[in-house]
Amino acid sequence: MDTKAFKRSLQHSENYNRKGFGHQAEVATQLQSEYQSNLIQEIRDRNYILQRGDVTIRLAQAFGFCWGVERAVAMAYETRQHFPTEHIWITNEIIHNPSVNQRMQEMEVEFIPIEGKNKDFSVVGTGDVVILPAFGASVQEMQILHDKGCKIVDTTCPWVSKVWNTVEKHKKIDYTSIIHGKYKHEETVATSSFAGKYLIVLNLQEAQYVADYIINGGNREEFLTKFAKACSAGFDPDRDLERVGIANQTTMLKDETEQIGKLFERTMLQKYSPIELNQHFQSFNTICDATQERQDAMLELVEHNLNLMVVIGGFNSSNTTQLQQIAFERRIPSYHIDTVERIKSGDSIEHRQLNGQLITTENWLPDGEIVVGITSGASTPDKVVEDVIEKIFAVKATAALV
């Protein structure tokens, strides 16, 4: 499929909208009431530090809702206001935050049901309204909805669209897109659908495996087994790694994406020559500004003398996991939670480890005076961060009375 031509056709359709419906002012008031926080603004005004009792909170200087998330959520609210009685569907979670997605359900925005491993688009009728989330949707899903005559509201983050444009450039010049990301993540599923030949690498270790194969060759069947779910149909590592371009899931660790890009640049230099490099390697900057800002702020925060970190965000949020990774690498006790309810009465907390396991830790708040670092993923409202901070203050104050 000529994905570029399809996008152009879709975007000129009268059933397509990616600019909203003119209800920004009304929606802004509603969003501020539901998601913003006076306490968080107070902490910002106090140089991102707040002390109460034995607890000092240090807040990262960039955290929470990014511009792309705010835009997506606002457009979803506008859509319901503009279509008060219509059936509204959404292809995936609008963002990776449980409280926001719960709010979507309360507004009667329904998820496309899944039958087996596939979405059942048969439930969507002609004239229904369908929201594409901030992560985007695959070109195949867009085509199904377009062919059905649905009203499509596209909230895809512009940074994600930028990555799509990059892999389309790779496809045009017959390069394989090496995508740094998680092959199951909605964003990477969408990005790969716009690519021609592609290979998805999770981390630097997998990238090194691919680089070694480019230089030395290897066991083709082992390679294809390793990346069976992370490559394009018919992928042949002996043929399709001669010319490669780098792209990324926008929420991955910036430093790792840069290292992967440099690794493949060095690999192609070694395999070919400096003169031939531009015929075998392409790299464009597709690192999201908001992701980079939050990671940089986290790197600055962990330089302080912290007793522990609390990282707030959806358990399926990739950018939140990357923030947790930074604390883990600094050996700071760190707790990834998605809602304030994970902090239990007494002194226990239910939290997600980097391996995905959900565990409960007792006595997680040390005795005496403590400094707690706080950050949140790009899909986390300030109101959720406020609730967590207030709960920490309350638990610590109760413990002091015992």
From Swiss-Prot:
GO terms for molecular function: 4 iron, 4 sulfur cluster binding; 4-hydroxy-3-methylbut-2-enyl diphosphate reductase activity; metal ion binding. [4Fe-4S] cluster binds at C66, C157, C288. (2E)-4-hydroxy-3-methylbut-2-enyl diphosphate binds at H96, H185, T250, S317, S318, N319, S379. GO terms for biological process: dimethylallyl diphosphate biosynthetic process; isopentenyl diphosphate biosynthetic process, methylerythritol 4-phosphate pathway; terpenoid biosynthetic process. Keywords: 4Fe-4S, Iron, Iron-sulfur, Isoprene biosynthesis, Metal-binding, Oxidoreductase. Binds 1 [4Fe-4S] cluster per subunit. It comes from the Bacteria. Pathway: Isoprenoid biosynthesis; dimethylallyl diphosphate biosynthesis; dimethylallyl diphosphate from (2E)-4-hydroxy-3-methylbutenyl diphosphate: step 1/1; Isoprenoid biosynthesis; isopentenyl diphosphate biosynthesis via DXP pathway; isopentenyl diphosphate from 1-deoxy-D-xylulose 5-phosphate: step 6/6. It catalyses: isopentenyl diphosphate + 2 oxidized [2Fe-2S]-[ferredoxin] + H2O = (2E)-4-hydroxy-3-methylbut-2-enyl diphosphate + 2 reduced [2Fe-2S]-[ferredoxin] + 2 H(+); dimethylallyl diphosphate + 2 oxidized [2Fe-2S]-[ferredoxin] + H2O = (2E)-4-hydroxy-3-methylbut-2-enyl diphosphate + 2 reduced [2Fe-2S]-[ferredoxin] + 2 H(+). InterPro entries: LytB/IspH (IPR003451). Dimethylallyl diphosphate binds at H96, H185, S317, S318, N319, S379. Transmembrane segments: none annotated. Disulfide bonds: none annotated. The active site is at E187. It is an enzyme of class 1 (oxidoreductase). Its EC number is 1.17.7.4. Isopentenyl diphosphate binds at H96, H185, S317, S318, N319, S379. Catalyzes the conversion of 1-hydroxy-2-methyl-2-(E)-butenyl 4-diphosphate (HMBPP) into a mixture of isopentenyl diphosphate (IPP) and dimethylallyl diphosphate (DMAPP). Acts in the terminal step of the DOXP/MEP pathway for isoprenoid precursor biosynthesis. Belongs to the IspH family. HAMAP family: IspH. This is 4-hydroxy-3-methylbut-2-enyl diphosphate reductase. It comes from Nostoc punctiforme (strain ATCC 29133 / PCC 73102). The gene is ispH.
